[in-house]
Amino acid sequence: MTEQRTIASSATREDEAADASIRPKRLADYLGQQPVRDQMEIYIQAAKARGEAMDHVLIFGPPGLGKTTLSHVIANELGVNLRVTSGPVIEKAGDLAALLTNLQPHDVLFIDEIHRLSPVVEEVLYPAMEDFQIDIMIGDGPAARSIKIDLPPFTLIGATTRAGLLTAPLRDRFGIVQRLEFYSPQELTRIVIRSAAILGIDCTPDGAAEIARRARGTPRIANRLLRRVRDFAQVKAAGHIDLAVAQAAMQMLKVDPEGFDELDRRMLRTIVDHFDGGPVGVESLAASLSEERGTLEDVIEPYLIQQGFLIRTARGRMVTPKAYLHLGLKPPRDRAPAIGEPGDLF
């Protein structure tokens, strides 16, 4: 089983504790995602002007891009309470009913991993979202009866990394749908500089830029790398982070300029050395790496594919010429492109 990686996009307990201190509270402080910010500003102002609860919001995208942070920002901008829960926690319809009946008018209910709600819970959520009512069964057997409970108008914010797993009836009940994209190095540099200032870290702009460009387009990873570089600088550089210190810290962490760690490089090397660059089936690759198939598909592959180092074809995984160059190797000229792989037309 893969140990926790420094450049993993999933949250650790340390991340959650640190996020509380550096999390932006207003849209003006929420860096990046400009189209999403512009749209949400309009929706929030319109809802406040009408004195209504804002329409329900679905936020999706890869982990670590700020879905939870955006939900906090929305609640703060609306000036209402935020109740936070997650799909796996809501096991029974009664759990959801308890949450909904304790909301105040216009409050925001945030459900993380909303794709993991059970079908029974979803059935309760539908009328709550549409009509602000829930039907609850009282009693058992022949004496059982259904009662209808009115709810205060509220805004549901659902977050998911896997929007494709949402059922169509649930997805269709969200009036606002926002996709968060990977951040540019310039946006991440601004985030690192802001976080460093809040945490009291002495970090130069070029040091922040070096951290940002290795953060895989993800603020959570950028902030985690900043904390690790801070540790390095505190011991080796009197607490000062500049370009040279950031590079030395990244070398210690084995995070290269592309944001790859040893596991990423090992996967690319395995395909090149053991399978002649591919194609190779995911099961064979997992066995060669002594990793689970799910780890390859959900943890390692996405960023390699997004950056153009790896492709999935009908016959399996293949590395691209870009991967050969990154490993310091010369791409073979006699390998024909597979289906789905970019190649010369002539």
UniProtKB/Swiss-Prot annotation:
Binding site for ATP: I22, R23, G64, K67, T68, T69, E130, D131, F132, R173, Y183, R220
Region entry Large ATPase domain (RuvB-L), spans: 1-183
Region called Small ATPAse domain (RuvB-S), residue ranges: 184-254
Single GO MF annotation: ATP binding
Region (Disordered): 1-20
Compartment(s) of residence: Cytoplasm
Domain notes: Has 3 domains, the large (RuvB-L) and small ATPase (RuvB-S) domains and the C-terminal head (RuvB-H) domain. The head domain binds DNA, while the ATPase domains jointly bind ATP, ADP or are empty depending on the state of the subunit in the translocation cycle. During a single DNA translocation step the structure of each domain remains the same, but their relative positions change.
Quaternary structure (record): Homohexamer. Forms an RuvA(8)-RuvB(12)-Holliday junction (HJ) complex. HJ DNA is sandwiched between 2 RuvA tetramers; dsDNA enters through RuvA and exits via RuvB. An RuvB hexamer assembles on each DNA strand where it exits the tetramer. Each RuvB hexamer is contacted by two RuvA subunits (via domain III) on 2 adjacent RuvB subunits; this complex drives branch migration. In the full resolvosome a probable DNA-RuvA(4)-RuvB(12)-RuvC(2) complex forms which resolves the HJ.
Protein name: Holliday junction branch migration complex subunit RuvB
Organism this protein belongs to: Xanthomonas campestris pv. campestris (strain 8004)
